[in-house]
A protein has these predicted regions:
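Intramembrane alpha-helical segments
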Residues: 100-170
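Membrane-embedded alpha-helical segments that form the functional core of polytopic membrane enzymes
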Residues: 37-41, 45-79, 87, 111, ...
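Multi-pass membrane catalytic core of lipid/isoprenoid biosynthesis enzymes
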Residues: 87-127, 217-241
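Interfacial loop-to-transmembrane junctions
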Residues: 99, 221, 259-290
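Cytosolic, membrane-interface loops and tails of multi-pass inner-membrane proteins
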Residues: 2-18, 77-98, 194-221
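Small-residue-rich segments of transmembrane alpha-helices in multi-pass membrane proteins
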Residues: 37-40, 91-94, 110, 154-170, ...
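Juxtamembrane boundary at the C-terminal end of a transmembrane helix
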Residues: 293-304
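Transmembrane alpha-helical segments that form the membrane-embedded catalytic/substrate-channel core
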Residues: 65-73, 135-143, 184-201, 234, ...
Length: 304
């Protein structure tokens, strides 16, 4: 078995040694912020004329609480395995700066608070989708990572639901616009996380996670899925234009950015290096916010 992190590593690399700082670190607020951006875009695109500001803030707050709870439960479940990975061994739980019990209790409280808050402040449909998102992430996806390489596909489902929550908060229905946004997020996550799995395949192997890059060491399956899923993403990204969620400027952006994303995937499949996997990963990080920003901007122009 791979040993836990040496004491010298833990002393020098732990970013927050105090209790409050460690708890905040466990919340993964940067990732929560990214989730809230997609939620806001769903809310904005679902709004007919003007933003209902109180409802928007209530939706973002409830969604943020649920996201924090999901991350806490995920880390509580994976504590022992995170100790084995270089990338995760200095997190609050593997270093015992936050106990597993505290993380579990905190995560469950966030689940109850976030779901209840959305039920009252937004609507029951949004609360149900939010609660389902947490359950899929923490109860289904997290343990599945140790047993099946399909975990990436399953994990993309909860990752795709926040923009749908934004849409349902204002529309109170599963409209085509919200489903299209969820589809874009779903297919974006697949090349994004497969690139990450290729970058850290040795680390995932140490942790015992059955990522596709671990179960297929040649990488052939990863490269094939990256190309196919990125192609599907480019096609799905045209739907907001077809359903009049955005206009021609967005369409041009979707095709240009999608083409560049696909080129990064093709480059990875040919070169098969960690550097090209990293390039695809960072391309995905640029692609999504640009796409969503132009979508929102073009929607504003379309309905002026």
């Amino acid at each position: 078995m791979t040993p836990a992190a040496p004491a010298s590593l833990l002393k020098n690399d732990i970013p927050n040694s105090n209790a409050i700082g460690s708890f905040v670190e466990m919340m993964k607020l940067k990732m929560v912020f990214h989730i809230l951006i997609t939620t806001f875009v769903g809310f904005y695109l679902g709004s007919k004329v003007e933003l209902e500001m109180p409802l928007m803030w209530h939706t973002l707050l409830g969604t943020g609480i649920l996201a924090i709870g999901a991350f806490a439960l995920n880390q509580a479940i994976e504590k022992d395995f995170d100790k084995l990975m270089v990338r995760t061994r200095t997190r609050p739980l593997p270093t015992d700066r936050v106990s597993r019990t505290a993380a579990f209790v905190f995560g469950l409280l966030c689940f109850a608070a976030g779901t209840g808050y959305l039920w009252v402040a937004a609507n029951p449909l949004t609360a149900i989708i939010g609660g389902l998102t947490l359950v899929l992430y923490a109860v289904v996806y997290t343990p599945m990572k140790r047993y099946s390489s399909l975990n990436t596909l399953v994990g993309a489902i909860p990752g795709a639901l926040p923009p749908l929550m934004g849409w349902t908060a204002v529309q109170n229905n599963l409209g085509m616009g919200g489903l299209v946004l969820a589809a874009i997020l779903f297919f974006w996550q697949l090349p994004h996380f497969l690139a990450l799995a290729l970058m850290y395949k040795d680390d995932y192997r140490l942790g015992g996670f059955q990522m596709l890059s671990v179960t297929d060491p040649s990488g052939e399956a990863c490269y094939r899925h990256i190309i196919v899923q990125t192609l599907i993403l480019v096609l799905v990204s045209v739907f907001p234009f077809l359903f009049r969620l955005a206009g021609p400027w967005y369409l041009a952006c979707a095709l240009i950015c999608g083409g560049y994303f696909l080129l990064a995937g093709v480059t990875l499949s040919r070169r098969r290096t960690r550097e090209s996997a990293r390039a695809l990963f960072f391309t995905s990080l640029i692609y999504l916010p640009v796409l969503l920003l132009v979508m929102a901007w073009d929607k504003a122009i379309l309905f002026v």
